[in-house]
């Protein structure tokens, strides 16, 4: 994407600052986890931080 800031993106980060977004394997909606939580149930075993969103 060119010239698009994070804030103008079509997908707003769904979690509070300091949390990360996990897409559960059995769900289509993100849940918010603390960065220290297990990501075993998340797609690709990852929890996406606001910086990485």
From Swiss-Prot:
Disulfides per UniProt: 15-32, 20-42, 22-47
Localization (cell): Secreted
Domain of life: Eukaryota
Function: Probable neurotoxin with unknown target. Possibly targets ion channels.
UniProt name for this protein: Conotoxin Cal9.2f
One annotated Gene Ontology cellular component of this protein: extracellular region
Biological source species: Californiconus californicus
Keyword set includes Secreted: yes
Propeptide positions: 1-6
Gene Ontology molecular function: ion channel regulator activity; toxin activity
Coarse class of the protein's main subcellular location: secreted
Domains: entry comment: The cysteine framework is IX (C-C-C-C-C-C).
UniProt entry tagged with the keyword Lipoprotein: no
Keywords from the named record: Disulfide bond, Ion channel impairing toxin, Neurotoxin, Secreted, Toxin
Expression sites (tissue/organ): Expressed by the venom duct.
């Amino acid at each position: 994407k060119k010239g698009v800031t994070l804030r103008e993106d079509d997908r707003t980060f769904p979690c509070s600052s300091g949390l990360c977004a996990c897409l559960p394997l059995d769900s289509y909606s993100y849940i918010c986890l603390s960065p220290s939580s297990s990501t075993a149930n998340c797609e690709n075993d990852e929890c996406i931080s606001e910086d990485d969103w």
